Amino acid sequence: MLCLQESGDCLRDQMRYMMRSLQDLKHLRRSCVAPPVGPPVRLRACKQLIAQRERRARLRISDASEASSYDSACCLSSSLEEEESASDPSAVSSPSSERSLEFDSGYSEASWQDEGVVLRRTKNIRVSSTACLRTNQLSNTRARPKSTSDACLESWTSFETASDPEDWTTSLLTRGRNRQPLVLGDNSFADLIHNWMDLPECPEQTELKHSSGRSFAKDFLVNIKRRIAGFSRSADGRRKSSDVTKLSKSIVPTKRLSCQIDVQHKMPFFYKSHTGLNELDTDYYQFSALMKSGSRTPIVCNDIIGYI
């Protein structure tokens, strides 16, 4: 029991020494820390950051609100330029033409004379969150450039005389860049050709009707004559073909019988066989020739016993 009490007292003393050492360390840390920065310096830094964020938010809101009244244009911004604008607050108020590239399919051909576009090549190029939106900082000061197509249309319309204001061809030329739908009539293609080309005068309807009736009657008579001639030729051809077939049927067996007959050569008496005896009549050779020719004519045997 005494040993346990002594050990407990030792542990208590060690805990007290540890607490005192921790308190001493706290006092040393407070004494070694540098004097705190003045509050006005911190307030200035915070105000600058807040002002920069407010300016960026205002620019984004203005771009989004004015996008409906301007054509779409893709603005490419780089991360390096954003860092420069964050470090230098004066760079935020610079015009958008110095920081971005504007792409417009209809007005890219005309170049500015008073201000040249500088193309910057950076490593990390990304499309900004308000891409395909154009700011109107420069649109209020100067007019929008015209493309070559608009200039050509103006030159074409200047030479033309004043015509009917309701003519859709003149509205097509004068309002070529307008995106309103153009409504055409049923005979729009004919009107277009009549206005743009010098067509000859059409003949009167009465003359056309008379000429068309006469030509139709002539064509009808010619077709009837051709059909009658064709029927007569076909009938004559059928008759001739039937006569030719009859003649050919009568001539075919004579042609088959007139083919050359292989006559067996004469051999000595001791080489003769019963199938090739020379004493047999010529009917035997005719019979063998008819069998080889394959004709369907009936075979008349004069001497059946001799063949056997």
From Swiss-Prot:
<feature type="region of interest" description="Inka box 2">
    <location>
        <begin position="281"/>
        <end position="308"/>
    </location>
</feature>
<comment type="function">
    <text>Inhibitor of the serine/threonine-protein kinase pak4/pak5. Acts by binding pak4/pak5 in a substrate-like manner, inhibiting the protein kinase activity. Required for the proper migration of neural crest cells during embryonic development, probably by inhibiting pak4/pak5.</text>
</comment>
<comment type="subunit">
    <text>Interacts with pak4/pak5.</text>
</comment>
<dbReference type="GO" id="GO:0001502">
    <property type="term" value="P:cartilage condensation"/>
</dbReference>
<dbReference type="InterPro" id="IPR039201">
    <property type="entry name" value="Inka"/>
</dbReference>
<dbReference type="GO" id="GO:0030291">
    <property type="term" value="F:protein serine/threonine kinase inhibitor activity"/>
</dbReference>
<dbReference type="GO" id="GO:0019901">
    <property type="term" value="F:protein kinase binding"/>
</dbReference>
<dbReference type="GO" id="GO:0005634">
    <property type="term" value="C:nucleus"/>
</dbReference>
<keyword id="KW-0539">Nucleus</keyword>
<feature type="region of interest" description="Disordered">
    <location>
        <begin position="81"/>
        <end position="105"/>
    </location>
</feature>
<keyword id="KW-0963">Cytoplasm</keyword>
<protein>
    <recommendedName>
        <fullName>PAK4-inhibitor inka1</fullName>
    </recommendedName>
</protein>
<dbReference type="GO" id="GO:0005737">
    <property type="term" value="C:cytoplasm"/>
</dbReference>
<dbReference type="GO" id="GO:0051216">
    <property type="term" value="P:cartilage development"/>
</dbReference>
<comment type="similarity">
    <text>Belongs to the INKA family.</text>
</comment>
<feature type="compositionally biased region" description="Low complexity">
    <location>
        <begin position="87"/>
        <end position="98"/>
    </location>
</feature>
<feature type="region of interest" description="Inka box 1">
    <location>
        <begin position="164"/>
        <end position="201"/>
    </location>
</feature>
<dbReference type="Pfam" id="PF15342">
    <property type="entry name" value="FAM212"/>
</dbReference>
<dbReference type="InterPro" id="IPR029267">
    <property type="entry name" value="FAM212"/>
</dbReference>
